[in-house]
UniProtKB/Swiss-Prot annotation:
The keyword RNA-binding does not apply. InterPro entries: DSB_repair_ATPase, P-loop_NTPase, Rad50/SbcC_AAA, Rad50_ATPase_archaeal, Zn_hook_RAD50. It comes from Haloferax volcanii (strain ATCC 29605 / DSM 3757 / JCM 8879 / NBRC 14742 / NCIMB 2012 / VKM B-1768 / DS2) (Halobacterium volcanii). Belongs to the SMC family. RAD50 subfamily. ATP binds at K12, N32, G33, S34, G35, K36, S37, S38, Q137. NCBIfam families: PRK02224.1, Rad50_Halo. This is DNA double-strand break repair Rad50 ATPase. Its cofactor is Zn(2+). Part of the Rad50/Mre11 complex, which is involved in the early steps of DNA double-strand break (DSB) repair. Rad50 controls the balance between DNA end bridging and DNA resection via ATP-dependent structural rearrangements of the Rad50/Mre11 complex. In polyploid organisms, the Rad50/Mre11 complex appears to restrain the repair of double-strand breaks by homologous recombination, allowing another pathway to act as the primary mode of repair. It holds the Pfam family AAA_23. Binds 1 zinc ion per homodimer.
Length: 893
C-alpha cells in the first residue's frame, strides 16, 4: 500500500493544502509547531475516522471554521482508492457529514462502513496500524515500555494469532455447551428408562382384555333397547302421518273457504272501481272541450292561424333568428363598452402607480440625504477616534524605546523571567528544606551532648565534650541561612522583573488591540466617505425621477377620461338592444302558452282513453274471478265428504302410547347404559394410551441413546479442536518469535555495529533482553534515552519486515511512517537512524514517510516537503522543494 495524494481544507492549522506523495523516502521538514505531524494525522484520520483521534471530532476542524474536508488517495494491492471525509461543526458538536470510499470493488458510504472496509483491506484496525507502521510523536518507546503481555497482545494481533485464540475460546465454549447438553440428555434418558420400567410392571394388556369383554356385553344390551325404540318410533310416525293428513285436509278446506271469501270481495270492489272510472271519463271529456276554447284565444294573441306543430316551429325559428342577430349586436356593443371601461381603469391605475412611485422616489431621496448627513457626522467622529488611537500607539512605542526588548517580544521576555523566578523559588524551597533538616540534626546533637552521649553514634562518653560534629552542623546551618537570604533576594529581584515584563505585555496587548481598532476605524472612514458621496448622488437622481413620473401620471389621467366618455356612449346602444330582446321574450312566452294548452289537451285525451281501457280490463278480470269462484265452491264440497273423525281418534291414542315408551327408553334406560359404556370406553382408551406411551417411551429411549452417543462423539471432537488451536497458536508464536528475533538482531547489528552491544534475545513470551559484548544482560529500561529510541525503532522495523514477509508470503503493508523519531536522539544516533531508513528501503519498503525538524535527516530523503506556519494568521502551508533549496532555507533560519 502507498499513499499518492492528500488534500485537506480547514484541518487543524491548515486552511487549504494539497500534497502528492511519491515512492521512496519522503521527509516532511519544518520547525517545531509548524504543523508537520498534522499532515500524517490527516492521512490516519482519513483511513480510520474518529478511531484515529486522541480527542474528539471538534479538534480536527480549524478554529473559527464550520467544516473540514480531507481527501486521501492511495494504491493497494494493485487497486486505486480514494477516501473523502467532511466534518461539520454545529453548535458545540461536530459530526461526520460525508464519508465515501471509492475503489475497484465499488463505492462504500458511511463512517463505520468505510472504517470496516479499510480495516479489511489492510488487515489491521487503527490500533494495529499504530503498532505496526505508524510511529507517532512521543510514542517511539511504546513497545519498549510495554509489559511482555501487552507486547505479546500487540504483536499477536498484528500477526493475526489472536484469531486462533478466539477460535480456541469458541471451541472451549462449544465444548462446555456440549457438556451441558450431554448432561441434560443423560438425565432425560435415565428418567425415560424409569418410566418404561413402571409401565411394564402394570400388566396393561390383561387389563385391556377384561375391559373390552365387559364393553361387548353392554353394547349388546344397548342394541336391543335401540331396536325396540325404533319400532315405537315407526308406530309414532304412522299415527302422526294419519293426524297430519287429517290436519292437511282441514287446512286445505279452510284455505278454500278463505279464497272464496276473497274472490267475492274482489269482484265487488272491482265493480265499484268500474263505476268510478266511468265518472272520471265523463269529466275528462268536458275538460278537453274547455281547453279547445282556450287554444283558439291563445292563437289570436300569438298571431297564428292554427296550432299545428309546423306553425309553432316556424314562428319559433323566426324569433330565434331575430334574437341571434340582436344578441350578436349586443355582445359586440358590450365588448366595446367593457374595453373602453377597462382601458380607462388601467390608465387610472397606471396614473396612481406612477404617482405612488414618484412619492416613493421623493421619500427615498430624503432617506438618502439623511443617510449622507448621518454618515458625514460619523466620519468626523471616526477621524477623531483615529487621531486618538494613533497618539496611543505612539505612546506605546515610546514606552518600548527604553525596554530590553522590541514591541511584540514582551511575551517571550515574560516567559523567560517567569521561568527564572520559578527556578529561584525551587532553589529557595530546596534550601529551606535542607535548612530545616540541618537545624533538626543540630538540635538532636545538642540534646545528646547535654545527655553525655556522642553526637555521632549516640553512645555514652566520659569527660569528652565531642563538640567537633556540633560545630560542623552549626556551620552548615549558618551557610544554609546565608544561602536562603541570597535566594530570597534573588526571588524578590526576579519577581520585580516579572512584574515589569507583565507591565510591558499589558502595554503590548493594548497596543495590538489599538492597532486592530485603528485598522477597523480606517476601513469605516473609507466606507463613510464612499457612503456620503454615493447617497447624495442617489438623492438627486431620485428627485429627477419623481418629477418625470408626475408628468407621465398626468398624461395617463387625461387618456382615462377620454376612454370613459366613449364607454358611456356605447352603454346607451347596449340598453336599446336589451329592450328589443325583452320584446322578443314576450312573443316567445305567447308561443309557449299555445304550445302548453295543446299539450294539456292531448294529455287529457290520453288519460281518458287509458281510463276506458282500464274499465274494460276490470270487466274481463271479474269474469275470470267468477269462474274461479264456482270451481272453489265445488272443491270445498268434495273435501267435506272425505274427513273421518273416528280414524283420527285412534291415531291420537297410538301416538300417545308410542311417545310414553320412547320417553322412558330415551330419557332413562339408554342414557344410563350409554354412560356405563362411555366409562368403559374411557378406561379402555386410558389403557391404550398408556400402551402407546410405552411404545413412544421406548422409541424416545432409543433416540436419546443415539443422541447421547452422538454428543459424546462431538464432545471428543470439540476437545481435540480446542487443544489443536492452542497448540497451533503456541507453535506459530514460537516460529514468529524466532523469525522476529533474527530480524531484530539483523536490524540492531546495523544500528549498533562495533558498539558495546552484541545481540538481543526475544523469549517465547515476548520478553526482551539486551546483551553487551561482555555477555552482561540488560533490561531495555537500562539503556539510555537515545539507545531505547533506536532499540524501539529496530523492533518496529523488524515487526514491519515480519508482517511484510510472513503473511501469505508478501502482504501489501501501509507506508512506514515515523513522526519525530529523533526526539530522543543526539547527532550520532540520528546518523544510525538514517542507516536504518536506508536499510528498510533496500529491503523493499516502497514508501517511507518521516516527519522531523532535524536537518540531519534531509540527506536521507528522496523527496523533501517543507511546512511553514504564518505567525500572523497561525495557518500552515506545505510545499515540495529540492534538497539544496531546503538546506539553504534552513541555513537562513
Amino acid at each position: 500500500m502507498r499513499f499518492t495524494r492528500i488534500a485537506i481544507r480547514n484541518f487543524k492549522p491548515y486552511e487549504d493544502a494539497e500534497l502528492d506523495l511519491r515512492d521512496g523516502v519522503t521527509v516532511i521538514h519544518g520547525v517545531n509547531g509548524s504543523g508537520k505531524s498534522s499532515l500524517l494525522e490527516a492521512c490516519f484520520f482519513a483511513l480510520y475516522g474518529s478511531k484515529a483521534l486522541a480527542g474528539t471530532l471538534e479538534d480536527v476542524v480549524t478554529t473559527g471554521a464550520d467544516d473540514a474536508e480531507i481527501t486521501l488517495e492511495f494504491v493497494h494491492d494493485g487497486g486505486e482508492y480514494r477516501i473523502d471525509r467532511r466534518v461539520r461543526v454545529s453548535g458545540d458538536r461536530a459530526t461526520t457529514a460525508k464519508c465515501v470510499l471509492d475503489g475497484p470493488e465499488g463505492t462504500v458510504e458511511g463512517a463505520r462502513d468505510v472504517r470496516r472496509h479499510v480495516a479489511s483491506l489492510l488487515r489491521m484496525d487503527a490500533e494495529a496500524f499504530v503498532n505496526c507502521a505508524y510511529v507517532q510523536q512521543g510514542e517511539v518507546n511504546k513497545l519498549i515500555n510495554a509489559t511482555p503481555s501487552q507486547r505479546q497482545d500487540m504483536i499477536d494481533d498484528l500477526l493475526q494469532l489472536g484469531k486462533l485464540e478466539t477460535y480456541r475460546e469458541r471451541a472451549g465454549n462449544a465444548r462446555l455447551g456440549v457438556e451441558d447438553v450431554l448432561t441434560k440428555k443423560r438425565s432425560v434418558l435415565e428418567d425415560v428408562e424409569s418410566q418404561i420400567e413402571a409401565k411394564e410392571d402394570a400388566d396393561l394388556h390383561a387389563t385391556l382384555n377384561a375391559l373390552e369383554s365387559e364393553l361387548d356385553s353392554l353394547d349388546e344390551e344397548i342394541s336391543n333397547y335401540e331396536s325396540q325404540r325404533d319400532k315405537a318410533k315407526s308406530a309414532l310416525d304412522a299415527a302422526e302421518a294419519t293426524l297430519d293428513e287429517h290436519a292437511e285436509k282441514r287446512e286445505r278446506l279452510d284455505e278454500i273457504e278463505s279464497a272464496i271469501e276473497d274472490l267475492t270481495a274482489k269482484i265487488s270492489a272491482d265493480e265499484t272501481k268500474r263505476d268510478d272510472l266511468s265518472e272520471r271519463v265523463r269529466e275528462l271529456d268536458a275538460a278537453a272541450d274547455e281547453l279547445e276554447s282556450d287554444i283558439d284565444d291563445a292563437l289570436a294573441r300569438a298571431d297564428l292561424d292554427d296550432a299545428s306543430d309546423e306553425a309553432i316551429a316556424d314562428a319559433r325559428e323566426a324569433l330565434s333568428a331575430r334574437e341571434s342577430e340582436l344578441r350578436d349586436d349586443l355582445s359586440e356593443a358590450r365588448t366595446r363598452a367593457q374595453a373602453f371601461e377597462t382601458q380607462a381603469e388601467r390608465l387610472r391605475e397606471r396614473a396612481d402607480d406612477l404617482e405612488s412611485r414618484a412619492e416613493e422616489k421623493r421619500e427615498a431621496a430624503e432617506v438618502d440625504a439623511e443617510t449622507a448627513a448621518e454618515a458625514e457626522r460619523e466620519l468626523e467622529s471616526f477621524r477623531e477616534t483615529r487621531a486618538e488611537l494613533r497618539s496611543a500607539l505612539d505612546d506605546a512605542e515610546a514606552r518600548f524605546e527604553d525596554a530590553p526588548v522590541e514591541l511584540g517580544e514582551a511575551a517571550d521576555l515574560l516567559e523567560e523571567r517567569r521561568e527564572a523566578r520559578s527556578e529561584a523559588r525551587e532553589s529557595l524551597a530546596e534550601t529551606e528544606t535542607e535548612l530545616k533538616n540541618a537545624r533538626e540534626r543540630l538540635a538532636e546533637a545538642e540534646r545528646l551532648r547535654d545527655a553525655g552521649k556522642c553526637p555521632e553514634c549516640g553512645q555514652p562518653v566520659e569527660g569528652s565534650p565531642h563538640v567537633d560534629a556540633i560545630s560542623e552542623r552549626e556551620a552548615a546551618v549558618e551557610s544554609l541561612e546565608a544561602d536562603r537570604e541570597s535566594l530570597e533576594s534573588a526571588v524578590e529581584s526576579r519577581s520585580a522583573a516579572v512584574e515589569a515584563a507583565e507591565a510591558l505585555v499589558e502595554v503590548e496587548t493594548r497596543a495590538s488591540s489599538r492597532r486592530d481598532r485603528l485598522d477597523l476605524v480606517d476601513e469605516r472612514i473609507a466606507d463613510r466617505e464612499e457612503t456620503v458621496e454615493s447617497r447624495r448622488e442617489a438623492a438627486e437622481e431620485k428627485r429627477e425621477a419623481a418629477a418625470e413620473l408626475d408628468s407621465e401620471a398626468e398624461e395617463k389621467r387625461e387618456a382615462a377620461t377620454t376612454q370613459a366618455e366613449r364607454a358611456e356612449e356605447v352603454a346607451e346602444t347596449v340598453d336599446s338592444l336589451e329592450s328589443d330582446l325583452d320584446t322578443l321574450d314576450d312573443r316567445r312566452d305567447r308561443l309557449d302558452r299555445v304550445e302548453s294548452l295543446v299539450d294539456t289537451r292531448a294529455e287529457k285525451i290520453d288519460a281518458r282513453d287509458r281510463l276506458r281501457e282500464k274499465r274494460e280490463t276490470l270487466a274481463e278480470v271479474n269474469r275470470e274471478r267468477r269462474e274461479h269462484l264456482r270451481e272453489r265452491r265445488e272443491r270445498r264440497d268434495e273435501l267435506r265428504e272425505t274427513v273421518d273423525e273416528e280414524a283420527v281418534e285412534g291415531a291420537k291414542q297410538r301416538k300417545k302410547n308410542a311417545a310414553a315408551y320412547l320417553e322412558r327408553v330415551e330419557d332413562e334406560v339408554l342414557p344410563e347404559l350409554r354412560e356405563k359404556r362411555d366409562d368403559l370406553q374411557s378406561r379402555v382408551g386410558g389403557v391404550e394410551a398408556e400402551l402407546e406411551q410405552l411404545d413412544d417411551l421406548r422409541e424416545r429411549r432409543d433416540h436419546l441413546a443415539e443422541r447421547v452417543d452422538a454428543l459424546e462423539s462431538v464432545h471428543d471432537e470439540v476437545s481435540t479442536l480446542e487443544s489443536t488451536y492452542g497448540d497451533l497458536r503456541a507453535e506459530l508464536r514460537q516460529r514468529n518469535v524466532e523469525v522476529l528475533e533474527r530480524m531484530l538482531n539483523e536490524t540492531f547489528d546495523l544500528v549498533y555495529a562495533n558498539d558495546a552491544y552484541s545481540r538481543i534475545r526475544l523469549d517465547g513470551e515476548y520478553g526482551l533482553t539486551v546483551f553487551q559484548k561482555d555477555g552482561t544482560a540488560l533490561e531495555p529500561e537500562q539503556l539510555s534515552g537515545g539507545e531505547r529510541a533506536l532499540f524501539n525503532l529496530s523492533l518496529r522495523c523488524a515487526i514491519y519486515r515480519l508482517l511484510a514477509e510472513g503473511i501469505d508470503g508478501a502482504a501489501p503493508l501501509p507506508p512506514l511512517i515515523l513522526d519525530e523519531p529523533t526526539v530522543f536522539l543526539d547527532g550520532g544516533h540520528v546518523s544510525r537512524l538514517v542507516d536504518l531508513v536506508e536499510d528498510m528501503q533496500s529491503r523493499g519498503v516502497k514508501q517511507i514517510l518521516i516527519v522531523s525538524h532535524d536537518e540531519d535527516l534531509v540527506g536521507a530523503a528522496d523527496d523533501l516537503v517543507r511546512v511553514e506556519k504564518n505567525p500572523t494568521t497561525n495557518r500552515s502551508t506545505v510545499e515540495r522543494t529540492d534538497a539544496p533549496i531546503v538546506e539553504g532555507a534552513l541555513a537562513d533560519d
